[in-house]
Amino acid sequence: MLKAFKEFAVKGNALDMAVGVILGASFGTIVKSLVDDLIMPPIGLVLGGVDFSNLFVTLRDGAAPGPYASLAAAKQAGAVTLNVGVFANTVVSFTIVAFAVFLLVRGVNTLRERLEGPAAPKQQACPFCFSKIDVRATRCPHCTATIG
């Protein structure tokens, strides 16, 4: 059993997946810092000095009545809050990660197309009725003509 586990763990796919998970976690940390430290502060400044990390709505006061100076103070008092700013930061982070993954997949697909060449066509035009038919068809389903 140990031998089988070693073979699995040393295979390229398992190692590639482990590296991907580790890099993905690190990338998430970088994106979080990018959003929290570089993107949201200027947006908050443009919107009148709003600190998004402390943008919240108090649903119910805690032990000490509000208003609270910060989200940390509200949580310390035990208040129930809607953390709108934290959610906004998370949405921006997700958008950045999703866009980065999109660019990565798009780049890999472009590279794959260049290496493999264009894909073989899957459809052809019937020479009689010009309908699109499968390239493997021997008879047109539209006009019933025999295809060469």
Swiss-Prot record:
Signal peptide: none annotated. The chain crosses the membrane at residues 15-35, 84-104. One of its GO terms (cellular component) is plasma membrane. Keywords: Cell inner membrane, Cell membrane, Ion channel, Ion transport, Membrane, Transmembrane, Transmembrane helix, Transport. GO terms for molecular function: mechanosensitive monoatomic ion channel activity. It is found in: Cell inner membrane. Pfam families: MscL (PF01741). It comes from the Bacteria. It is a multi-pass membrane protein. Its main location: membrane. InterPro entries: MS_channel (IPR001185), MSC/AndL (IPR037673), MscL_channel (IPR036019). The keyword Lipid metabolism does not apply. Gene3D superfamilies: Large-conductance mechanosensitive channel, MscL, domain 1. The keyword Ribonucleoprotein does not apply. Disulfide bonds: none annotated. Homopentamer. Belongs to the MscL family. Channel that opens in response to stretch forces in the membrane lipid bilayer. May participate in the regulation of osmotic pressure changes within the cell. This is Large-conductance mechanosensitive channel. The gene is mscL.
